[in-house]
Amino acid sequence: TNFVIQELEKFGIEYTMLDNNSMGSFEEAVKKTTKIVYMESPSNPLLSIIDIKRMADFCYGRDLLSVVDNTFASAVNQNPKDYGIDLVIHSATKYIGGHSDICAGFVLGDQKHLDQVRQTALNFGGSLNPFMCHLLERSLKTLFVRVEKQNQNALQVSSFLETHDSVDRVNYPGLPTHVEHVIAEKQMRGYGGMISFELKDQDIIDFQKKLKLIQPAISLGGVETIISAPVLTSHKKLSKEQRKKEGIKDNLLRLSVGIEHADD
């Protein structure tokens, strides 16, 4: 969101931001100059789910390039290419790396598009050094078992939070109460390790200070459980009006669930 709002206009790129599955909204948003539909599912930090197959068909029928950021789901839980998406991107810093010690990214797609991406990378930089590649290879060996455990833990933790008196709302696509749970169930094998929730009466800073095992940090997807407040981190640079429009409340916390024992 920060990149779109603050950087794209510098390059003369126009954009329209949408936050729902209403095809009517997408129909209205598409202009003659529209080239790309960029999606994130689950989204950060509200864990909204997009019907990937429906959007792939929508883009294909209008000759639009479809791109899905699959970071929150990981390839273990969701494969947008199977539903017709043109390009899939991952922040390998997160679940693929899994140990909070890598800065990297992946792009998946057909050869034509990847050739363009590769040429752009050559022109602007972005090559990984050998040691980073070694760490990525190490991480891929444990990706499945890590994410499977994070799936299990997140479902248990989100179910606990949903019944807690101090919590006003829980966002996790694996919960039957999630507004897009049926869509998630259709296209995901697991629901990931990301949860967001809104506190009722507690201050978000005081709450984080009381935590013992869980540390405040801005990354995600690692083996350790960490927490952050979007209003103070990822969405801090947005105006209050922009955050309100996106549904980012001041009492919202984002939890990246690790592989510890869920009871802890």
Across the structure, where does each feature detected by a protein language model lie?
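Conserved PLP-enzyme active-site core in the AAT-like
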Residues: 1-166, 171
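PLP-dependent enzyme catalytic core of the Aspartate aminotransferase-like
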Residues: 5, 14-16, 28, 32, ...
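Glycine-rich beta-alpha junction loops
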Residues: 94, 157, 174-178, 199-201, ...
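Short, well-ordered beta-strand elements within core beta-sheets of diverse protein domains
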Residues: 136-145, 192-199, 254-258
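A generic structural signal for well-ordered coil/turn residues at beta-strand boundaries
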Residues: 102, 191-193, 221-223, 249-251
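Short, flexible turn/loop "capping" segments at secondary-structure junctions
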Residues: 98, 130-132, 186-189, 245-251
